[in-house]
């Protein structure tokens, strides 16, 4: 499996730790779409880069990290076909995979500690989409464009 990872300047250390963690624990290839610099970096750039890599099939899933996880997830969710969830605890991360078939995870380097971030990543990576009623009731509705 290939995982795309992106970040802004706030989350360089988190990105590196999570990247190494995933490679060591799961043996997945993790492709960097973020910055390695502490110089100010505009988070939407890496959020959209990872999202585009997911929808284009360059990677299977994406993880994005900024200060709160919110801004970078909003940038990712602009890309058609992306379902990026911002999580600050493992339970929501796991259920986002099981019920909503999320294909991207976001979290904040200023919100969660690194050990909790690893737990969130574990819950999200091991969660499997259940389909069934979740597909009928949720994903079809979520995937339809809103008409005004």
Residue ranges with predicted function:
Residues 29-40:
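A short beta-strand-loop structural module common to alpha/beta enzyme folds
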Residues 65, 70-106:
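Mid-chain, well-packed structural core segment of small domains
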Residues 46-64:
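Short, structured active-site "lid" loops
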Residues 17-28:
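A short, Lys/Arg-enriched amphipathic alpha-helix followed by its capping loop at the start of a domain
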